[in-house]
Amino acid sequence: MRILGLDVGTKTVGVAISDEMGWTAQGLETIKINEEREIFGFDRVSELVKQYNVDKIVVGLPKNMNGTIGPRGEACQRYAESLRELLQLEVILWDERLSTMAAERLLISADVSRKKRKQVVDKMAAVVILQGYLDSK
């Protein structure tokens, strides 16, 4: 059983995958999207689901620090619902507050250059989201 973790932004979707035991998450890739042109990367997510035999998807849900859900969170909820309908899989929304900051800190502590951090931060945020979910189980 593998789980896909997604960090959905306005321009990219960071992707992480669990190991088969569901213990660890590792970064997979970053999918370019364009919300304004309604290009959401669903085809690529579908390919990854098939390639890795995924049976569950965890989508990061950005909440405000007071627990409310703003416009970005609502967009992630719509994204998750679209995936659920398209792929007929369980899609879980997971509180992702501060996941991008945590990913950024991890990359800085690993002495990753600013240019490289920009390229991988979304993928690392997906790892932080998915690992948080896996650790809760």
Curated annotation (Swiss-Prot):
Looking at the UniProt record for this protein, which Gene Ontology cellular component terms does it annotate, in alphabetical order? cytosol
What is the main EC category here?
A: hydrolase
InterPro entries in alphabetical order: RNaseH-like_sf, YqgF, YqgF/RNaseH-like_dom, YqgF/RNaseH-like_dom_sf
The GO biological-process annotations, alphabetized, read as: rRNA 5'-end processing
Q: Which Gene3D superfamilies match?
A: YqgF/RNase H-like domain
Asked whether the UniProt record includes Phosphoprotein among its keywords, one would answer: no
Protein known as: Putative pre-16S rRNA nuclease
Protein source organism: Bacillus cytotoxicus (strain DSM 22905 / CIP 110041 / 391-98 / NVH 391-98)
Upper lineage ranks?
Bacteria, Bacillati, Bacillota, Bacilli, Bacillales
